[in-house]
């Protein structure tokens, strides 16, 4: 989701920037 820290996203926890 383009975030730079671990956050609850649609795919789950994403501890890295995602686009």
Curated annotation (Swiss-Prot):
TM annotation in the entry: none
One cellular-component annotation, GO: extracellular region
Sites bearing Valine amide, chain numbering: 19
This protein's UniProt keywords: Amidation, Neuropeptide, Secreted
Subcellular location, record wording: Secreted
GO biological process: neuropeptide signaling pathway
Top-level taxon in the UniProt lineage: Eukaryota
Function comment: Mediates visceral muscle contractile activity (myotropic activity).
Similarity comment: Belongs to the periviscerokinin family.
Protein name per UniProt: CAPA-Periviscerokinin-2
